[in-house]
Amino acid sequence: MRLIKLHHLRPAPGSRRARVRVGRGEGSKGKTAGRGTKGTKARAPVRPGFAGGQIPLHMSIPKLKGFKNHKKVEYSVISIKRLCEAYPSGGVVTRDNVMSVIGKKRGFVKLLSDGEVTVKFDITVDKASAAAVEKITSAAGTVTQAR
């Protein structure tokens, strides 16, 4: 039995086609090399984005205007209704508890007044609307705002 080595490996006959070398002499793919005669496509390739004499798309679309405020503070909001669903017995609710209800790990939290309060809450959030504070304090609870 003969030992097979890497240099013995060959592709199966007919599985590989030879690369066509164009533009070499006057044969079938010679002279114009399958590009036809004359014209832009026979000469140099057209650059990407070239629109053939009309204004290109990247020049016809307006530039962005204005600016992006990098100091903008975005709040994740939670309503009183959702808070009551998560904590039906009320009690002390920290900012981290609220973040776990929202499903986020970082950022700021704002409490909104959508819904009715039936139990006492002692809640700590970054911000709360005036109506939300009024609803919770009317149910004998407290709201501590961190910001």
Curated annotation (Swiss-Prot):
GO cellular component terms, semicolon-separated: cytosolic large ribosomal subunit
Keyword Transferase carried by entry: no
Keywords assigned: Ribonucleoprotein, Ribosomal protein, RNA-binding, rRNA-binding
Matching SUPFAM superfamilies: Ribosomal proteins L15p and L18e
GO biological process assignments: translation
Region of interest: Disordered: 1-49
GO function term, MF aspect, one: structural constituent of ribosome
Pfam families named in the record: Ribosomal_L27A (PF00828)
NCBIfam families, per database record: rplO_bact
Entry's family note: Belongs to the universal ribosomal protein uL15 family.
Function: Binds to the 23S rRNA.
Name of the protein in its database record: Large ribosomal subunit protein uL15
Organism for this UniProt entry: Tropheryma whipplei (strain Twist)
Taxonomic placement: Bacteria, Bacillati, Actinomycetota, Actinomycetes, Micrococcales
